[in-house]
């Protein structure tokens, strides 16, 4: 990735692809395959199949240190018909990304891209969690943890995000504790 413009174009492309092809909770097969291919193209090691279609990718800078920070994005969509005239409207009848999970996944891909471009500045190992089934109970996160997708004892912190329509575009809000969970 050479420029901010390249990243912006890619973010738009990835998000529109994901938005066009939404999948319901625990049915995120093609979304998972899209992410896996993206990771392979960048030689990022990952494991998949967590809670069905979940993925955990890793950027390891110290193989002797089991500690890491985790970044998480959800992948599932809602059983809602999208009525949107945009060219990137859902192509799957009765299913749409109405909660922004296409954006969340895109943001995590973009973060990984930026991290790879600045890997020499990293001071900790990182894990990237693509979670299926966020909109159902029990959710994909609890299933992934039960299955051992990450070693919670070695996780120094987990970061997630959620789009917030009430905030001005281009701004970021932070909360010190659990938020929107």
Would you name each region that the model predicts?
Residues 1-97, 106, 113-122:
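Acidic/His- and Gly-rich active-site-bordering loop/insert found
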Residues 111-112, 145:
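Short, well-ordered amphipathic alpha-helices
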Residues 108-111, 137:
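Membrane-embedded alpha-helical core segments of multi-pass
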Residues 78, 85-96, 103, 120-181:
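Histidine/acidic-residue-rich, glycine-tolerant segments that coordinate divalent metal ions
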